[in-house]
Design a protein with these regions (language model features):
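Asp-based, Mg2+/Mn2+-dependent phosphohydrolase catalytic module
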Residues: 1-237
């Protein structure tokens, strides 16, 4: 509320005040009544903005509904899609981070020297792709190896890491061999008989190779699904 006020907007108490716009964001104490009031205002013609559309959020006890799940409830009730989102998968947040860093007396970091990092393909990684950033998907949250192998082009990261500790390591780059096999150091993967095969389903290098093999098969027209990719059980680092 303070941020909205500082930007010259006036906050009203509810839909009975006929707001011109509604901003819905993540609020863990969100109630049915609050979502209903958003719906009433949107139905009455208020422009609908949201802060982010993450459907789920990792919590200590497991995966919980995120802001996007609450937004879907309003969309279902009103039939109205938000006109814009300040959060991912839009790239504004990454652009703003670079500009904020520059406003503190530092040089503006060019996009080619920046990297978008996250555990969600449909927000963190898609935002990086939309904004022209390299991206790193980490496996410490929502995304799992199967989802990586089945990712459509707009959700594919530049790099894959087990966790943030690998930021300090040089990533091994998968290489495509003449026979169509993808090799990543000692691991290899290939597409054969309608399925991705991998030499080592316990290593990150095996996953990197398998991801490349799966993406190549999909790009060539294979209708990829879970039955066509290996099950990874990554060993301890």
């Amino acid at each position: 509320r303070d941020e909205v006020t500082r930007n010259g907007l006036t906050i009203v108490n509810g839909p009975e005040d006929h707001p011109q716009a509604v901003i819905q964001g993540w609020y863990p104490e969100m109630t049915w009544q609050m979502m209903a009031e958003v719906s009433y205002a949107v139905e009455a013609g208020a422009t609908y903005f949201v802060t982010n559309r993450d459907l789920t959020i990792p919590r200590e006890m497991g995966i919980a509904p995120g802001c996007g799940s609450m937004i879907r409830a309003v969309i279902t009730a009103t039939g109205v899609e938000p006109v814009a989102s300040a959060g991912k998968p839009e790239a504004y947040m990454y652009d703003e981070a670079r500009e904020l860093n520059a406003s503190e007396g530092h040089d503006l970091v060019p996009k080619e020297s920046s990297i978008a990092i996250g555990d969600r393909l449909d927000t963190d990684i898609e935002a990086g792709n939309r904004g022209g950033y390299d991206s790193l998907a980490v496996l410490t949250g929502v995304t799992n190896p199967t989802e990586l192998m089945l990712a459509p082009e707009h959700l594919r990261p530049t790099f894959i890491a087990r966790d943030l500790r690998e930021l300090g390591e040089i990533q091994s780059e998968p290489v495509r061999c003449e026979d169509g096999t993808w090799e990543c150091r000692k691991a290899s993967a290939w597409f054969e008989n309608g399925r991705v095969q991998v030499s080592d389903p316990t290593s990150m290098d095996g996953l990197r190779a398998a991801v490349c093999a799966a993406w190549e098969a999909a790009d060539k027209g294979a209708q990829m699904d879970e039955s066509m990719v290996p099950n990874f059980v990554l060993g301890e680092q």
